[in-house]
Amino acid sequence: MWLGAQLRVILNTKDRPPTLWVQKPVTTHGWGMQRNRIIYTALFSIVLGDTAFAADQDRKADTDRHSGKTAVGHVARKSAETHAKDVEQIRVRGHLASTVASSATKSNTPLIETAQSVTVITRDEMDARGVLTLNQAVRYAAGVTADTRGGEGTRYDLFDLRGFTVPTFLDGLKFQDSPTGFAVAQTDTFRLDRVELLKGPASALYGQSSPGGLTAMSSKLPTDQRFYGGVNATGGMFDLYRVDADVGGFATDDGMVRYRVYGTINGQHTQLSRTGSRRFSISPSFTFGGDGPTTLTLLGNYQYDPENGSYGGVPLIGSLKRASYGYLPRNFYDGDVSAEKFNRRQGAITYILNHRFNDDWSFSTRGRYDDIRTVYRSVYDNGYYNSDDGTSGQMLSRSAYGTQEHTYNLAFDSQFKGKVRTGPLRHALMFGFDYMQQKANDTEAYGDAPDLDVLHPDYHMAIADLTPYLRYVTKSHQIGAYGQDEIRWKRLILTGSIRNDWYRSNQTEYFEQSNDRQSARQITWRASGLYHFDFGLSPYISYSTSFQPQSGTVSNDGGATLRQAHPSIGKQLEGGLKYQIPGTSVLFTAAGFHIEQSNVLVSVANTGYSLQSGLVHSDGFEFEAHAQPFHNLMVTAAVSFQKVKDDSTGKPLIQSGKGNASLFAFYTMPSGPLKGFGFGGGMRYSNKTYGGEATYGSVWLPQYALFDASIAYDLNNMSHSLHGWKVAASVRNLFDRNYIANCFAYGADGQYCYYGERRNAQASIGYSW
């Protein structure tokens, strides 16, 4: 769990921190030499691997846009903008730039100058909390409805932002959804360097996307260290085991070729009886070009999950509501051992090419090919009992389902970036083009399963062979062209983005001999304004739009004529305040937002078509604080309130919560007999969540508060012979609170719930060099 921390800066790690560069002109004539050395000294933050989308060399093209700290004090903006032809480079050690993000603008921009809500989750924070999954990583962020599949649904990253499910990006490229939702890639969080949550519509730069935002992840890539590495072993409750290794350095003496290899072997039982997960993953990467103007990074990944827990739940009656027999235990399993299978193989190869033409213009392009194969088979409960009133009895109705899906995904994104002046205005221009393509083969099967006696369960019953009923071949592609202009005048920053997308899909179903075609063209845009006062305050306002293709048939004349559904349209108005204490990484953000999603499909009873008249509103307020006032103290806090309503039903959007709150802090003793000992803890509170309509009425999940704790110790402080060794431990849900994480209630059609994660403790020992 502490492997990442051992290789980084914060929390008293021993390894080399990121490198910061000082550009200092060399002059040789007269009195100008001393003056120039004072005026033109500039320092900027480097964010490779710590931004979700920007590659290593992007920092060189964006440096004169960012302010920072120097060893001698604050740097004036004019000096940071000035360039001398002959410069000498001096390396300076510094801390990770947790106050810089790239997802909002596709360039490395300080959060204090970003007119949109972005939550940054650093590698150090993930290590301090003992994070094992992306769901766990985002739990302390404002606006997140976490663990929508409870504590057992860990095979996918399932959470909502501002009431909406959001897509996931890795290294700037989208993980494409599969037609069934089962052949979806998952990234092991230990190979991640950083996670950003971009909140609100982002289609103006990324194409089809959710109005809630997106999740941006960044891989660990080669750094400028000559040789480094670490090995970490972790064990814990539910028979957790994992071994992680991360090794990198220079492949050539001059550093023109660099490498990094990450690998893991891990597994554990889940909190449900008779289920478990295993994973094998390796990710090699190479960077060619060193610190030159042209660099190429190649990144590969192969991951095999022979099993990955259960995807089942528990009936609402017996979990959220008391049944005639009482309540089901949290380890209740609704499936059957002989029919439980989840097998996923995923492979990917990525390239990132960057070229710097000069100090003003650069070009970058990246692409990824994914190949994902999933075999899934399960027996699951139907959400009700086979009894007269549905609330008594103990025989749980069940069915069986299976699918085999194979997806091939291509994604590319290329962009030119440049800086120009028009009078007093400074422009940061970007022109981009991206392309996505997918082919998916899927076969689905269905069958009956015997009822399960919940008081005396038999998990080895005879399950009949499944009957295939659907076989799809789906092909889709999206082309997008976009542009952006960040205009700066004194302390005012205006940003405008616009994009045109062309989307097509063709789905053929071979059992029913049907064909579904979609073709859409959509323009999306964003405009924002921010003013950065010199005392650290930045008020801002922004407006952004999004679109999402939908599958379905629509009629506006009672079924006389039919057409394919148009994409849903999202729009958001957001305003807020950001404050960063000058010269520190202490950042406070507050934002209010109003989101509308229109063109939502509304089904018409007893017909095969829908009306495209649905409208969803999401209104809320968020506050976050991220502070590292000292190198050995890290504090994060968040509060959010939201109201998400589906106008077609007059009810809240299902699985949308009313808000959350959290606080986490980690402190490392800097001196004394306990030097190197770190300890911390956190609280995360979830307000009520709407779970749909049950047979008895509206379902509301009660609020709950959970507590986590972490400790760590650098053994070098015990003995110099233990240099590089570190031990750590963490506990989630410290007091083992019994709670329901989420429910899906559809009246007589089924009522399901999911227990939240039980108390889960783990400990690790690691060595780094």
Regions found by a protein language model. Give the residues of each.
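Extracytoplasmic beta-strand/coil segments of soluble accessory domains associated
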Residues: 95-118, 123, 135-174, 193
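Short acidic/polar hinge/loop motifs at secondary-structure boundaries
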Residues: 158, 173-199, 218-219, 325
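Outer-membrane beta-barrel translocator/receptor signature
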Residues: 177, 190-193, 204-284, 290-294, ...
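Acidic/polar loop-and-plug regions of large Gram-negative outer-membrane beta-barrel proteins
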Residues: 266-270, 283-289, 293-356, 371-407, ...
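Structural signature of Gram-negative outer-membrane beta-barrels, strongest in the C-terminal barrel
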Residues: 287-291, 407, 426-438, 472-597
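Membrane-embedded beta-barrel scaffold of Gram-negative outer-membrane proteins
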Residues: 354-358, 362-368, 372-378, 539, ...
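Conserved C-terminal beta-signal and adjacent last beta-strands/turns
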Residues: 429, 541, 573, 654-769
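Gram-negative outer-membrane beta-barrel transporters
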Residues: 491, 594-596, 612-693, 766
